[in-house]
Every structure is written in C-alpha cells, then in structure tokens.
A protein has these predicted regions:
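N-terminal Sec/ER secretory leader and immediately downstream segment
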Residues: 1, 12-14, 39, 45
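N-terminal alpha-helical signal peptides/signal-anchor transmembrane segments
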Residues: 3-21
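Low-complexity, acidic interaction segments enriched in glycine
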Residues: 19, 23-168
Length: 168
C-alpha cells in the first residue's frame, strides 16, 4: 500500500505541475522542488450568461461566458498533501533506497497532441525482501513494474488494484 500511495502522490503532484506549467514534469527532482517551493493559484470560476441581439438571426439570443478570478496562491505541498508533508520521501520506493523512475512526453491521439507521464517501481525492487522466498513468481514478472500513467496511452491510472488499501 505504501508504494501505491506514493505513486498516487506523485500523480497528484504531476497534475498540479501540469496545471501550472502546461506539461508534465520528466525529472523527479524537479517535481520534488515544485512540491517544495511551488505555489498553486486559487481560482474562482463563475459561469454567466447574458442576452444580446444577433444581427444574423435578428433576435435576442443567450450568450454564455466564463469568468475566472485568481483569489490568491497557496504552497503546493499544503494544497495537495496538507501541513507537515515530507517531499523527499515522495520519490523513494518504501523499504529501499531506490527512486521511482519517471518519464514524460507527448503522444498524438486522434490528431490531438496529449501530454503523458509514467512513474514506475520495478517489482524486483518493491519485493526485494521476499524475492528469494518465491523465485518462480519473480521469474514470471522480472521486467514488470507497478506503474501509474503511460507514455503510450493517454491515461493517468495505475496498473494495480488498490481495493485492499482503500478499505483500511
């Protein structure tokens, strides 16, 4: 559960990074610096509509518009994770000294460029403490990893089920 929680924290940080910078971050240390020192705008959005005279149709018509106003800024770490969050712990795979692997890019899906990212933790690293006890299981998944996001598909979901962790 610790690994998947950290993957989800990185996903939330990536989404905040993209909202502020327009693209996902490809360097995990840059993402940590953003969480540590970055700020997120607090935006108030109001949908409004008004009537106007349309010369083509020669009648009153309704026009919808959106008004946005920046109310202030808040530190990324506080906004996403609350006070007392340790940004440096976010990048380490629990129980090891290894770091998560992170990449970002763009793909073209249906003639639209879509920003993508992928964060992964190899099974061999995550389960290093029990790997010797179950060698047959690890031979089957030697090159696989717990992953969130994808560099080939426009998704930010993970390749794992987190139902056990959510029920606690």
């Amino acid at each position: 559960c610790d690994v998947t929680e950290k993957l989800e924290n990185i996903r939330e940080a990536q989404l905040a990074y993209k909202s502020e910078n327009g693209a996902f971050c490809s360097d995990i240390n840059e993402l940590v610096a953003f969480v540590d020192t970055g700020v997120i705008n607090i935006i108030e959005r109001k949908d409004t509509s008004f009537m106007y005279y349309d010369k083509v149709y020669q009648k009153e018509m309704n026009k919808d518009s959106v008004m946005q106003r920046v109310l202030g800024q808040e530190p990324v770490a506080v906004q996403l994770f609350g006070d007392g969050f340790d940004e440096q712990s976010m990048i380490r795979i629990p129980g090891t000294d290894s770091l998560f692997t992170m990449n970002a890019g763009k793909i073209n899906k249906n003639a639209v460029d879509v920003a993508t990212f992928e964060v992964s933790a190899p099974y061999a690293t995550v389960f290093a403490d029990v790997q010797d006890s179950y060698p047959q299981a690890f031979n089957k998944v030697a090159n696989e990893a717990l992953t969130i996001g994808s560099l080939t598909e426009p998704t930010i979901s993970g390749n794992y089920e987190n139902t056990y962790c959510k029920s606690e």
